[in-house]
Amino acid sequence: MANLTGTIKGLYPETLSPEQLEKLRGFKIQTRITNEKYLRTHKEVELLISGFFREMFLKRPDNIPEFAADYFTDPRLPNKIHMQLIKEKKAA
């Protein structure tokens, strides 16, 4: 693969002007805020991630990438998440 180090301006923060660095910093902060708001309003994401980690820690697979691929492509997963959402709404 070709070495792209330093060939495209902007890949490295040290090549940015102070104004560009400030804009980049603001963009990163805004992106984090937006992501946090999304995660807080979409309970299904929390259920997906916590379910994955729970299963991974219980089963302790040797090949984690393969386990993750199998977990997230399980055709039953959407229904499991839907049922958990319903269960949590009833409990609230």
Swiss-Prot record:
Top-level taxonomic group: Eukaryota
Domain RIIa residue range list: 43-77
CDD domains on file: DD_RIIAD1
Protein's recorded name: RIIa domain-containing protein 1
Species the sequence originates in: Bos taurus (Bovine)
Gene: RIIAD1
